[in-house]
């Protein structure tokens, strides 16, 4: 559970929001800080991308899917696992979806 702006925000045991409708960009900053990440414009690009992906496909992207989709949209420079791991060192799919207020990707351990 998180306390944000005086409200209790329910999370699962790993810190993923139970209700993605409670997500906001200011809340994302708090979640990122809990993950040890200070959000840069590059982080926001990925966070917004995974949110859009989720809205379109109704699923959070696992790492392979995330890399491929990022490459299709942004090119090889940003659509590769090295770039994404620099931004999200504990796992791009896990951390980006958590910060984006989405469910944990199905194929993530």
Curated annotation (Swiss-Prot):
The active site is at residue 108. InterPro entries: DsrC-like_C (IPR042072), DsrC-like_dom_sf (IPR025526), DsrC-like_N (IPR043163), DsrC/TusE (IPR007453). Its EC number is 2.8.1.-. Keywords: Cytoplasm, Transferase, tRNA processing. Coiled coil: none annotated. One of its GO terms (cellular component) is sulfurtransferase complex. Changing residue 108 to S: Loss of activity. It is an enzyme of class 2 (transferase). It comes from the Bacteria. Its main location: cytoplasm. GO terms for molecular function: sulfur carrier activity; transferase activity. The keyword tRNA processing applies. GO terms for biological process: tRNA wobble position uridine thiolation. It is found in: Cytoplasm. Gene3D superfamilies: 3.30.1420.10, DsrC-like protein, C-terminal domain (1.10.10.370). Belongs to the DsrC/TusE family. Part of a sulfur-relay system required for 2-thiolation of 5-methylaminomethyl-2-thiouridine (mnm(5)s(2)U) at tRNA wobble positions. Could accept sulfur from TusD. Interacts with the TusBCD complex. Interacts with MnmA. This is Sulfurtransferase TusE. It comes from Escherichia coli (strain K12). The lineage of its organism: Bacteria, Pseudomonadati, Pseudomonadota, Gammaproteobacteria, Enterobacterales. The gene is tusE.
